[in-house]
């Protein structure tokens, strides 16, 4: 799904770095996966993949399964990790992350 945007080796390394529960940090993940240096168009493509229900927002349930977008066998985020991730990205307080909020969080 991320072919042409993210390198498989970067995805593998990023997932390995947060394999244990409680170790996911979005900033570290976005850096390791190589997303920070990508164009706005590529970041928008990644957002579109993560937005499973195509609502133009990433909601809490989609964030919980965030890592599984990159590898089907990846773990779900813990409730605490999900809450921290949502709080970091939800700048307008509506309980979900839009594409502009996601891009701002990636560029962090």
Swiss-Prot record:
Quote the InterPro entries the UniProt record gives. EF-hand-dom_pair (IPR011992), EF_Hand_1_Ca_BS (IPR018247), EF_hand_dom (IPR002048), Parvalbumin (IPR008080)
User: Looking at the UniProt record for this protein, which Gene Ontology cellular component terms does it annotate, in alphabetical order?
Assistant: cytoplasm
Q: Output the Gene3D superfamilies linked to this UniProt entry.
A: EF-hand
Q: Where does Ca(2+) 2 bind?
A: 90, 92, 94, 96, 101
Q: Which residues are recorded as binding Ca(2+) 1?
A: 51, 53, 55, 57, 59, 62
Question: Which residues are recorded as modified (N-acetylalanine)?
Answer: 1
| Residue ranges constituting the EF-hand domain according to the UniProt record | 38-73, 77-108
CDD domains referenced in this protein's UniProt entry, alphabetically? EFh_parvalbumin_beta
Q: Which UniProt keywords apply?
A: Acetylation, Allergen, Calcium, Metal-binding, Muscle protein, Repeat
Is Nucleus among this UniProt entry's keywords? Answer: no
Molecular function as annotated in GO:
calcium ion binding
Q: Name one Pfam family in it.
A: EF-hand_7
Family classification:
Belongs to the parvalbumin family.
What exactly does this protein do? In muscle, parvalbumin is thought to be involved in relaxation after contraction. It binds two calcium ions.
The record's misc note reads: Is regarded as an important allergen.
Q: What is this protein called?
A: Parvalbumin beta 1
């Amino acid at each position: 799904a991320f072919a042409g945007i993210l390198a498989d080796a970067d995805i593998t390394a990023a997932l390995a770095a947060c394999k244990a529960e409680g170790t996911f940090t979005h900033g570290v993940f976005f850096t390791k996966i190589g997303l920070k240096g990508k164009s706005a168009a590529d970041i928008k493509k990644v957002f579109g993949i993560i937005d499973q229900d195509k609502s133009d927002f990433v909601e809490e349930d989609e964030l919980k399964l965030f890592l599984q977008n990159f590898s089907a066998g990846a773990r779900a985020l813990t409730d605490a990790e999900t809450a921290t991730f949502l709080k970091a990205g939800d700048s307008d307080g509506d309980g979900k992350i839009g594409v502009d909020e996601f891009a701002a969080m990636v560029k962090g």
